[in-house]
Amino acid sequence: MNGKKLYISDVTLRDGMHAIRHQYSLENVRQIAKALDDARVDSIEVAHGDGLQGSSFNYGFGAHSDLEWIEAAADVVKHAKIATLLLPGIGTIHDLKNAWQAGARVVRVATHCTEADVSAQHIQYARELGMDTVGFLMMSHMTTPENLAKQAKLMEGYGATCIYVVDSDGAMNMSDIRDRFRALNAVLKPETQTGMHAHHNLSLGVANSIAAVEEGCDRIDASLAGMGAGAGNAPLEVFIAAADKLGWQHGTDLYALMDAADDLVRPLQDRPVRVDRETLALGYAGVYSSFLRHCETAAARYGLSAVDILVELGKRRMVGGQEDMIVDVALDLRNNK
Protein backbone atom coordinates (compact mmCIF):
# COMPACT_ATOMS: atom_id res chain seq x y z
CA MET A 1 0.00 0.00 0.00
CA ASN A 2 3.01 2.31 0.31
CA GLY A 3 1.52 4.08 3.31
CA LYS A 4 -1.45 5.60 1.46
CA LYS A 5 -4.76 6.03 3.22
CA LEU A 6 -7.69 4.00 1.95
CA TYR A 7 -10.85 5.87 1.02
CA ILE A 8 -13.70 4.20 2.92
CA SER A 9 -17.02 4.45 1.09
CA ASP A 10 -20.03 3.32 3.12
CA VAL A 11 -23.07 1.99 1.24
CA THR A 12 -25.36 1.06 4.17
CA LEU A 13 -27.89 3.74 3.21
CA ARG A 14 -28.02 2.82 -0.49
CA ASP A 15 -27.18 -0.84 -1.12
CA GLY A 16 -28.57 -1.53 2.34
CA MET A 17 -31.93 -0.29 1.08
CA HIS A 18 -32.36 -3.60 -0.78
CA ALA A 19 -32.18 -5.57 2.47
CA ILE A 20 -35.27 -3.83 3.86
CA ARG A 21 -37.13 -3.16 0.60
CA HIS A 22 -36.10 0.53 0.57
CA GLN A 23 -37.94 1.29 3.82
CA TYR A 24 -35.43 3.29 5.90
CA SER A 25 -37.17 6.03 7.87
CA LEU A 26 -35.64 9.50 7.91
CA GLU A 27 -34.71 8.96 11.54
CA ASN A 28 -32.94 5.69 10.61
CA VAL A 29 -30.96 7.64 8.01
CA ARG A 30 -30.01 10.39 10.46
CA GLN A 31 -28.89 7.95 13.15
CA ILE A 32 -26.86 5.76 10.82
CA ALA A 33 -25.31 8.69 8.93
CA LYS A 34 -24.29 10.37 12.20
CA ALA A 35 -22.74 7.16 13.52
CA LEU A 36 -20.79 6.68 10.29
CA ASP A 37 -19.67 10.30 10.33
CA ASP A 38 -18.56 10.02 13.95
CA ALA A 39 -16.57 6.92 12.94
CA ARG A 40 -14.89 9.04 10.21
CA VAL A 41 -15.74 7.20 7.01
CA ASP A 42 -14.95 9.23 3.90
CA SER A 43 -18.31 9.06 2.15
CA ILE A 44 -21.84 7.87 2.86
CA GLU A 45 -23.90 6.81 -0.14
CA VAL A 46 -27.62 7.61 0.13
CA ALA A 47 -30.39 6.73 -2.35
CA HIS A 48 -33.00 4.15 -3.21
CA GLY A 49 -31.25 0.81 -3.67
CA ASP A 50 -31.45 1.20 -7.45
CA GLY A 51 -30.20 4.78 -7.38
CA LEU A 52 -31.86 8.12 -7.98
CA GLN A 53 -35.48 7.67 -9.10
CA GLY A 54 -35.29 3.92 -8.47
CA SER A 55 -38.53 4.04 -6.50
CA SER A 56 -40.92 2.33 -8.91
CA PHE A 57 -43.16 -0.66 -9.49
CA ASN A 58 -40.24 -2.53 -11.11
CA TYR A 59 -37.71 -2.03 -8.31
CA GLY A 60 -39.94 -1.37 -5.31
CA PHE A 61 -41.29 1.85 -3.86
CA GLY A 62 -39.27 3.64 -1.21
CA ALA A 63 -40.57 4.88 2.13
CA HIS A 64 -39.28 8.36 1.20
CA SER A 65 -37.88 10.15 -1.82
CA ASP A 66 -34.17 10.16 -2.60
CA LEU A 67 -34.00 13.87 -1.85
CA GLU A 68 -35.60 13.43 1.57
CA TRP A 69 -33.09 10.72 2.45
CA ILE A 70 -30.14 12.76 1.13
CA GLU A 71 -31.21 15.88 3.01
CA ALA A 72 -31.65 13.88 6.22
CA ALA A 73 -28.10 12.53 5.97
CA ALA A 74 -26.57 15.84 4.88
CA ASP A 75 -28.12 17.56 7.90
CA VAL A 76 -26.12 15.50 10.40
CA VAL A 77 -22.69 14.93 8.82
CA LYS A 78 -19.69 17.12 9.52
CA HIS A 79 -16.83 15.14 8.01
CA ALA A 80 -18.04 12.63 5.42
CA LYS A 81 -19.18 13.53 1.94
CA ILE A 82 -22.68 12.47 0.94
CA ALA A 83 -22.60 10.24 -2.14
CA THR A 84 -25.38 8.97 -4.34
CA LEU A 85 -25.88 6.47 -7.17
CA LEU A 86 -27.30 7.14 -10.62
CA LEU A 87 -28.15 4.56 -13.27
CA PRO A 88 -28.58 6.24 -16.68
CA GLY A 89 -32.06 5.42 -17.91
CA ILE A 90 -33.47 5.45 -14.39
CA GLY A 91 -32.03 8.71 -13.09
CA THR A 92 -31.52 11.83 -15.21
CA ILE A 93 -29.21 14.83 -15.08
CA HIS A 94 -32.17 16.75 -13.65
CA ASP A 95 -32.27 14.26 -10.77
CA LEU A 96 -28.53 14.64 -10.35
CA LYS A 97 -28.84 18.42 -10.07
CA ASN A 98 -31.54 18.01 -7.43
CA ALA A 99 -29.35 15.56 -5.49
CA TRP A 100 -26.50 18.08 -5.59
CA GLN A 101 -28.77 20.78 -4.23
CA ALA A 102 -29.93 18.39 -1.48
CA GLY A 103 -26.33 17.84 -0.36
CA ALA A 104 -24.76 15.06 -2.45
CA ARG A 105 -21.15 15.78 -3.41
CA VAL A 106 -20.13 12.40 -4.84
CA VAL A 107 -21.94 10.51 -7.58
CA ARG A 108 -21.32 7.01 -8.83
CA VAL A 109 -22.65 6.67 -12.37
CA ALA A 110 -23.48 2.99 -12.79
CA THR A 111 -23.87 0.98 -15.98
CA HIS A 112 -23.77 -2.68 -16.90
CA CYS A 113 -20.13 -3.67 -17.38
CA THR A 114 -20.38 -3.59 -21.20
CA GLU A 115 -22.47 -0.41 -21.52
CA ALA A 116 -20.21 2.40 -20.31
CA ASP A 117 -21.12 4.46 -23.38
CA VAL A 118 -24.53 5.33 -21.88
CA SER A 119 -22.82 7.18 -19.01
CA ALA A 120 -21.16 9.98 -20.98
CA GLN A 121 -23.82 12.66 -20.49
CA HIS A 122 -24.24 11.98 -16.78
CA ILE A 123 -20.51 11.85 -16.02
CA GLN A 124 -19.87 15.06 -17.93
CA TYR A 125 -22.72 16.87 -16.18
CA ALA A 126 -21.55 15.66 -12.76
CA ARG A 127 -18.12 17.13 -13.46
CA GLU A 128 -19.74 20.42 -14.48
CA LEU A 129 -21.51 20.48 -11.11
CA GLY A 130 -18.16 19.96 -9.40
CA MET A 131 -19.00 16.52 -8.04
CA ASP A 132 -16.51 13.78 -7.24
CA THR A 133 -17.46 11.64 -10.24
CA VAL A 134 -17.08 7.86 -10.20
CA GLY A 135 -17.69 5.29 -12.94
CA PHE A 136 -19.34 2.13 -11.60
CA LEU A 137 -19.17 -0.98 -13.82
CA MET A 138 -21.83 -3.34 -12.51
CA MET A 139 -21.75 -7.14 -12.84
CA SER A 140 -18.05 -6.95 -13.69
CA HIS A 141 -17.82 -10.75 -13.78
CA MET A 142 -19.86 -10.87 -17.01
CA THR A 143 -17.07 -9.66 -19.27
CA THR A 144 -13.34 -10.32 -19.59
CA PRO A 145 -10.78 -8.24 -17.70
CA GLU A 146 -9.59 -6.78 -21.00
CA ASN A 147 -13.07 -5.73 -22.09
CA LEU A 148 -13.78 -4.31 -18.63
CA ALA A 149 -10.64 -2.20 -18.95
CA LYS A 150 -11.87 -0.84 -22.29
CA GLN A 151 -15.15 0.17 -20.65
CA ALA A 152 -13.25 1.77 -17.77
CA LYS A 153 -11.20 3.74 -20.27
CA LEU A 154 -14.41 5.08 -21.84
CA MET A 155 -15.66 6.31 -18.46
CA GLU A 156 -12.29 7.90 -17.76
CA GLY A 157 -12.52 9.67 -21.11
CA TYR A 158 -15.94 11.08 -20.22
CA GLY A 159 -14.46 12.60 -17.06
CA ALA A 160 -14.72 10.01 -14.29
CA THR A 161 -11.79 10.32 -11.89
CA CYS A 162 -12.33 6.92 -10.25
CA ILE A 163 -13.51 3.64 -11.81
CA TYR A 164 -15.03 0.78 -9.82
CA VAL A 165 -14.91 -2.96 -10.33
CA VAL A 166 -18.39 -3.97 -9.13
CA ASP A 167 -19.11 -7.57 -8.14
CA SER A 168 -22.88 -7.05 -8.09
CA ASP A 169 -23.50 -10.79 -7.94
CA GLY A 170 -20.88 -11.70 -5.36
CA ALA A 171 -19.74 -14.22 -7.96
CA MET A 172 -16.01 -13.50 -8.21
CA ASN A 173 -13.02 -14.86 -6.35
CA MET A 174 -9.68 -13.25 -5.54
CA SER A 175 -8.06 -14.27 -8.82
CA ASP A 176 -10.95 -12.72 -10.75
CA ILE A 177 -10.51 -9.49 -8.81
CA ARG A 178 -6.74 -9.37 -9.31
CA ASP A 179 -7.09 -9.95 -13.05
CA ARG A 180 -9.57 -7.09 -13.41
CA PHE A 181 -7.56 -4.57 -11.41
CA ARG A 182 -4.39 -5.46 -13.30
CA ALA A 183 -6.25 -4.90 -16.57
CA LEU A 184 -7.56 -1.51 -15.38
CA ASN A 185 -4.17 -0.46 -14.06
CA ALA A 186 -2.63 -1.23 -17.46
CA VAL A 187 -4.83 1.27 -19.33
CA LEU A 188 -5.98 3.99 -16.92
CA LYS A 189 -4.04 7.17 -16.26
CA PRO A 190 -1.90 7.07 -13.10
CA GLU A 191 -4.03 9.79 -11.53
CA THR A 192 -7.30 7.90 -12.09
CA GLN A 193 -8.32 6.07 -8.94
CA THR A 194 -9.91 2.63 -8.76
CA GLY A 195 -12.50 1.23 -6.38
CA MET A 196 -13.93 -2.12 -5.31
CA HIS A 197 -17.59 -2.91 -4.58
CA ALA A 198 -17.98 -6.44 -3.23
CA HIS A 199 -20.92 -8.64 -2.32
CA HIS A 200 -20.66 -11.43 0.20
CA ASN A 201 -22.68 -14.19 -1.51
CA LEU A 202 -19.68 -16.56 -1.57
CA SER A 203 -18.37 -15.15 1.76
CA LEU A 204 -15.55 -13.49 -0.19
CA GLY A 205 -16.53 -9.84 0.19
CA VAL A 206 -13.71 -8.98 2.58
CA ALA A 207 -11.16 -11.25 0.89
CA ASN A 208 -11.93 -9.76 -2.53
CA SER A 209 -11.64 -6.24 -1.11
CA ILE A 210 -8.24 -7.10 0.36
CA ALA A 211 -7.12 -8.53 -3.00
CA ALA A 212 -8.23 -5.30 -4.68
CA VAL A 213 -6.20 -3.16 -2.28
CA GLU A 214 -3.18 -5.38 -2.84
CA GLU A 215 -3.54 -4.57 -6.56
CA GLY A 216 -3.51 -0.82 -5.86
CA CYS A 217 -7.23 -0.12 -5.35
CA ASP A 218 -7.86 3.28 -3.72
CA ARG A 219 -11.49 3.10 -2.57
CA ILE A 220 -13.39 0.33 -0.81
CA ASP A 221 -17.17 0.04 -0.56
CA ALA A 222 -18.56 -1.68 2.52
CA SER A 223 -21.62 -1.52 4.76
CA LEU A 224 -22.39 -1.84 8.45
CA ALA A 225 -23.23 -5.46 9.28
CA GLY A 226 -22.91 -6.11 5.54
CA MET A 227 -26.29 -4.41 5.04
CA GLY A 228 -26.95 -4.81 1.33
CA ALA A 229 -28.50 -6.87 -1.42
CA GLY A 230 -28.21 -10.65 -1.31
CA ALA A 231 -25.84 -11.77 1.45
CA GLY A 232 -24.86 -8.13 1.71
CA ASN A 233 -21.73 -6.19 0.94
CA ALA A 234 -18.33 -6.59 2.51
CA PRO A 235 -19.15 -5.93 6.19
CA LEU A 236 -17.52 -2.59 6.97
CA GLU A 237 -16.50 -3.37 10.52
CA VAL A 238 -14.98 -6.71 9.44
CA PHE A 239 -13.02 -5.15 6.59
CA ILE A 240 -11.68 -2.43 8.90
CA ALA A 241 -10.61 -5.02 11.48
CA ALA A 242 -8.78 -6.94 8.74
CA ALA A 243 -7.22 -3.73 7.43
CA ASP A 244 -5.97 -2.96 10.95
CA LYS A 245 -4.38 -6.40 11.14
CA LEU A 246 -2.62 -5.68 7.84
CA GLY A 247 -1.37 -2.32 9.07
CA TRP A 248 -3.33 -0.33 6.49
CA GLN A 249 -4.33 3.28 7.06
CA HIS A 250 -8.06 3.92 6.92
CA GLY A 251 -8.76 6.66 9.45
CA THR A 252 -11.91 5.11 10.90
CA ASP A 253 -12.89 4.05 14.43
CA LEU A 254 -13.34 0.27 14.42
CA TYR A 255 -15.23 0.08 17.71
CA ALA A 256 -17.65 2.84 16.72
CA LEU A 257 -18.39 0.90 13.53
CA MET A 258 -18.92 -2.33 15.49
CA ASP A 259 -21.39 -0.56 17.78
CA ALA A 260 -23.28 1.02 14.88
CA ALA A 261 -23.53 -2.31 13.06
CA ASP A 262 -25.04 -4.16 16.02
CA ASP A 263 -27.01 -1.36 17.69
CA LEU A 264 -28.43 0.52 14.69
CA VAL A 265 -28.37 -1.66 11.58
CA ARG A 266 -28.81 -5.32 12.46
CA PRO A 267 -32.11 -4.70 14.33
CA LEU A 268 -33.62 -3.30 11.11
CA GLN A 269 -33.16 -6.52 9.14
CA ASP A 270 -36.52 -8.21 8.59
CA ARG A 271 -34.62 -10.93 6.70
CA PRO A 272 -31.14 -11.74 8.03
CA VAL A 273 -28.38 -10.47 5.75
CA ARG A 274 -26.20 -13.57 5.58
CA VAL A 275 -24.98 -16.40 3.40
CA ASP A 276 -27.78 -18.95 3.25
CA ARG A 277 -29.33 -21.25 0.64
CA GLU A 278 -30.81 -18.43 -1.44
CA THR A 279 -28.00 -15.90 -1.20
CA LEU A 280 -25.38 -18.56 -1.91
CA ALA A 281 -27.35 -19.39 -5.06
CA LEU A 282 -26.96 -15.75 -6.15
CA GLY A 283 -23.18 -15.94 -6.01
CA TYR A 284 -22.94 -19.44 -7.42
CA ALA A 285 -25.29 -18.77 -10.35
CA GLY A 286 -24.00 -15.23 -10.96
CA VAL A 287 -27.30 -13.43 -10.39
CA TYR A 288 -27.73 -9.74 -9.54
CA SER A 289 -27.91 -9.55 -5.74
CA SER A 290 -30.93 -7.26 -5.58
CA PHE A 291 -33.02 -9.95 -7.30
CA LEU A 292 -33.16 -11.86 -3.99
CA ARG A 293 -36.24 -10.34 -2.36
CA HIS A 294 -38.13 -10.25 -5.67
CA CYS A 295 -37.35 -13.95 -6.25
CA GLU A 296 -38.50 -14.90 -2.78
CA THR A 297 -41.78 -13.08 -3.36
CA ALA A 298 -42.29 -14.84 -6.71
CA ALA A 299 -41.40 -18.22 -5.21
CA ALA A 300 -44.01 -17.81 -2.47
CA ARG A 301 -46.64 -16.65 -4.95
CA TYR A 302 -46.17 -19.51 -7.42
CA GLY A 303 -45.25 -22.34 -5.07
CA LEU A 304 -41.65 -22.64 -6.26
CA SER A 305 -38.15 -22.77 -4.82
CA ALA A 306 -36.40 -19.40 -4.86
CA VAL A 307 -33.15 -21.25 -5.61
CA ASP A 308 -34.66 -22.78 -8.76
CA ILE A 309 -35.73 -19.33 -9.96
CA LEU A 310 -32.30 -17.85 -9.20
CA VAL A 311 -30.44 -20.64 -11.00
CA GLU A 312 -32.64 -20.24 -14.07
CA LEU A 313 -32.07 -16.47 -14.06
CA GLY A 314 -28.34 -17.17 -14.01
CA LYS A 315 -28.65 -19.56 -16.96
CA ARG A 316 -30.47 -16.85 -18.91
CA ARG A 317 -27.77 -14.30 -17.99
CA MET A 318 -30.26 -11.74 -16.71
CA VAL A 319 -28.79 -8.41 -15.67
CA GLY A 320 -29.74 -5.57 -13.35
CA GLY A 321 -32.87 -3.85 -14.60
CA GLN A 322 -34.54 -7.08 -15.71
CA GLU A 323 -36.44 -7.59 -12.47
CA ASP A 324 -39.62 -7.86 -14.51
CA MET A 325 -38.31 -11.15 -15.94
CA ILE A 326 -38.37 -12.83 -12.53
CA VAL A 327 -42.11 -13.45 -12.76
CA ASP A 328 -41.73 -14.67 -16.37
CA VAL A 329 -39.11 -17.19 -15.27
CA ALA A 330 -41.26 -18.29 -12.33
CA LEU A 331 -44.24 -18.87 -14.61
CA ASP A 332 -42.08 -20.85 -17.05
CA LEU A 333 -40.81 -23.05 -14.23
CA ARG A 334 -44.32 -23.61 -12.87
CA ASN A 335 -45.69 -24.48 -16.30
CA ASN A 336 -42.84 -26.93 -16.92
CA LYS A 337 -43.34 -28.79 -13.65
Swiss-Prot record:
Q: Give GO terms: molecular function aspect only.
A: 2-isopropylmalate synthase activity; 4-hydroxy-2-oxovalerate aldolase activity; manganese ion binding
Catalysed transformations (reactions): (S)-4-hydroxy-2-oxopentanoate = acetaldehyde + pyruvate
- Which residues are annotated as active site? H18 (proton acceptor)
Q: Which residues form a coiled coil?
A: none
Residues binding Mn(2+), per UniProt? D15, H197, H199
- EC top class named in words: lyase
What keywords would UniProt list here? Answer: Aromatic hydrocarbons catabolism, Lyase, Manganese, Metal-binding
UniProt pathway annotation: Aromatic compound metabolism; 3-phenylpropanoate degradation
The residues covered by the Pyruvate carboxyltransferase domain are 6-258
Q: Which InterPro entries match?
A: 2-IPM_HCS-like, 4OH_2_O-val_aldolase, Aldolase_TIM, DmpG_comm, DRE_TIM_HOA, PYR_CT
Q: Tell me which residues bind substrate.
A: R14, D15, S168, H197, Y288
Q: Which Gene Ontology BP annotations are present?
A: 3-phenylpropionate catabolic process; L-leucine biosynthetic process
Q: Which domain of life is it from?
A: Bacteria
Tell me one Pfam family matched here: DmpG_comm
- Quick check: keyword Lyase in the entry? yes
Q: Which SUPFAM superfamilies does the record associate with it? A: Aldolase, post-HMGL domain-like
Q: Which residue positions hold the site described Transition state stabilizer?
A: R14
- EC assignment: the record states 4.1.3.39
Point out the signal peptide segment.
none
PROSITE patterns, per database record: PYR_CT
Name the family. Answer: Belongs to the 4-hydroxy-2-oxovalerate aldolase family.
User: What function does this protein fulfil?
Assistant: Catalyzes the retro-aldol cleavage of 4-hydroxy-2-oxopentanoate to pyruvate and acetaldehyde. Is involved in the meta-cleavage pathway for the degradation of aromatic compounds.
Q: How does it assemble?
A: Interacts with MhpF.
| This protein's name | 4-hydroxy-2-oxovalerate aldolase
Name the species this protein comes from: Escherichia coli O81 (strain ED1a)
